[in-house]
Design a protein with these regions (language model features):
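N-terminal metal-binding scaffold of metallo-dependent hydrolase/deaminase domains
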Residues: 1-99, 459
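Histidine/acidic residue-rich metal-binding segments in metalloenzymes
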Residues: 191-205, 221-314, 318-342, 359-384, ...
Length: 518
């Protein structure tokens, strides 16, 4: 298919994309942007040099007169030697264009331009196993059990093929950074971390790949094993993780694996002390349920403060925030703010899993998302991410962050009164939480020319079609990447007979012995 913009010649080191529609909040422009946004989903954004360069005159963008009601602005972007050389407000024609100083001129036709995406919470090691070991009930408990069953099929060869298939898919959709949680038990961990290291090196320069150890909180009862895990994570330059109050029964005495009763605070202290000793950042699964009793985020926040932890903390899911009273919600969010926690919402997966009837005959009554706008009001950084794709926890998905953004807008009503800062939730904010540097996730003069051009010209157009004809630019080069075909997975998925999974209705022993691994 012919691209809707003819790319510059591959040898061209200088070109200008005119008439690109860009969210003001992902541009490096004058500090006036702090007066124009409506919803803050990135803590201290107006103070960060990563987001707004103070008194920048080179950008020549006046947000008062150029941005529309959704914070979109029409700009010209000049790329030189793989970097963004200049960003300025679009004009019909300017002197630089007439005398050739802007290089080849390309017309974006007012199409939306975004920085490349950062997907901060995924599980690519489990990807594309949904048909092999099917979650018959579609529930969180059913996912746990069928995921355990699928373990018999794992080898380094098939794991490599599935994980790389996912990376190729994300890259073709315009993602430049992925953080994946990795199964880290004795058998699977012996495979996942070496394969992760191999792929991280292979994909260096295309996708920044980060790994998080995935363990339930009760695992940390074993001091020797938990210390060895921290040592393994450190050796692989990873992030330490734990699932806290993160099952259907999270926050209650019926969850011995992730809530852990009276031992919860002691175990959290152990997690933080290991992170301090081994100088590791932390990434938790927390409160993936609709239980008012589930207050894992509060306990993590208090543990961070109690242990004077200074590293980066990310907390994914946080669904039970929607079940809290107004008073408790305020207490939890204020604690998370003090602990400098970044919250990640996984709307697609939690729409599929949460509040599902195990018999399948009832419609869910609540949404599996935290209270995103209330979190933003407390000035807590928020990210949106893919989570699982085509596995036991979500039978669909393609690591397309535009789809994640689009559906999050619909699910959480992020578009009113204005989308404001929310584009940062899939670009700038996760890049900062992942420590990717000052220009990643931004369109910034002097930064890498890494961005995605869409044909849709406003959000209503962008979100109404798949944008399958999007154009990917990396380091100034136009990338001819396409999503891989599913038949590439046939050699590993067809060699195994489909696994017979758990019965639709679980018995009580199953319920008490489930172990959350999402």
């Amino acid at each position: 298919m012919k691209p809707w913009i003819e790319p510059p010649e591959s040898s061209s080191s200088l070109y200008t994309i005119k008439n690109a529609t860009v969210p003001m909040v992902v541009l490096s422009v004058a500090d006036k942007t702090s007066h124009h946004t409506t919803t803050n989903c990135n803590k201290n954004a107006s103070e960060s040099p990563d987001v707004a360069s103070t008194n920048s005159s080179s950008s020549k963008i006046d947000p008062y007169y150029s941005a529309d009601r959704d914070g979109l602005v029409l700009v010209d972007i000049t790329v030189k030697d793989g970097k963004i050389d200049r960003i300025k407000q679009s004009e019909d024609k300017e002197e630089g264009e007439r005398n050739g100083q802007l290089g080849t001129i390309l017309d974006a036709k007012k199409g939306v331009c975004m920085p490349t995406f950062c997907d901060i919470h995924t599980h690519v090691d489990k990807s594309h196993t949904c048909e092999r070991s099917r979650n018959e009930s579609g529930s969180l408990a059913g996912a746990d059990k069928s995921c355990e069953i699928d373990e018999i099929h794992w080898t380094e060869e098939e794991l490599t093929l599935r994980m790389e298939f996912s990376l190729k898919t994300a890259y073709a959709h315009g993602t430049s950074a992925i953080r994946t949680h990795l199964m880290s038990g004795p058998s699977q961990g012996a495979m996942t971390w070496p394969v992760f290291m191999k792929l991280r090196e292979k994909w260096k320069g295309r996708i920044e790949l980060q790994g998080v150890s995935l363990s339930i909180l009760s695992f940390f009862k074993d001091e020797h094993a938990s210390r060895n895990l921290a040592r393994t994570v450190k050796g692989h330059k990873g992030i330490l993780g734990a699932a806290v109050s993160c099952s259907d029964y999270g926050g209650t005495d019926f969850d011995p694996h992730t809530t852990c009763g009276d031992e919860l605070h002691t175990l959290l202290d152990r997690v933080f002390q290991l992170a301090i000793e081994f100088e590791l950042d932390l990434d938790f699964h927390v409160d993936e349920n609709g239980n008012e009793e589930s207050k894992g985020l509060l306990h993590i926040s208090n543990a961070a403060i109690r242990n004077n932890y200074k590293g980066q903390i990310v907390c994914g899911h946080c669904c039970s925030l929607a079940a809290q009273t107004a008073e408790n919600l305020q207490i939890i969010l204020q604690a998370a703010n003090r602990a400098n926690i970044t919250i990640v919402s996984l709307p697609l997966v939690n729409q599929w899993l949460q509040n599902r009837c195990e018999f399948g005959e009832k419609t869910p009554r609540r949404r599996g998302v935290p209270l995103l706008k209330e979190i933003a009001t407390e000035n807590i950084p928020i990210c949106l991410a893919s989570d699982n794709i085509r596995d036991q926890f979500y039978g669909y998905g393609d690591l397309d962050m535009l789809e994640v953004f689009r559906l999050s807008v619909f699910i959480a009503h992020l578009d009113r009164p204005s989308l404001g800062d929310w584009p940062k939730a899939v670009t700038t904010t996760p890049a900062q939480a992942m420590g990717l540097g000052k220009t990643h996730g931004l369109l910034k003069e002097g930064g890498a020319a890494d961005f995605v051009l869409f044909r849709g010209r406003q959000y209503s157009e962008l979100f109404s079609r798949s944008q399958h004809d999007r154009l990917i630019i990396r380091n100034g080069q136009w990338i001819a990447a396409t999503v891989p075909h599913y038949d590439e997975l046939d050699p590993i998925l067809n060699q195994h007979a489909l696994t017979k999974t758990q019965p639709l209705v679980e018995n009580n022993n199953d319920k008490e012995n489930r172990k959350t691994t999402v």
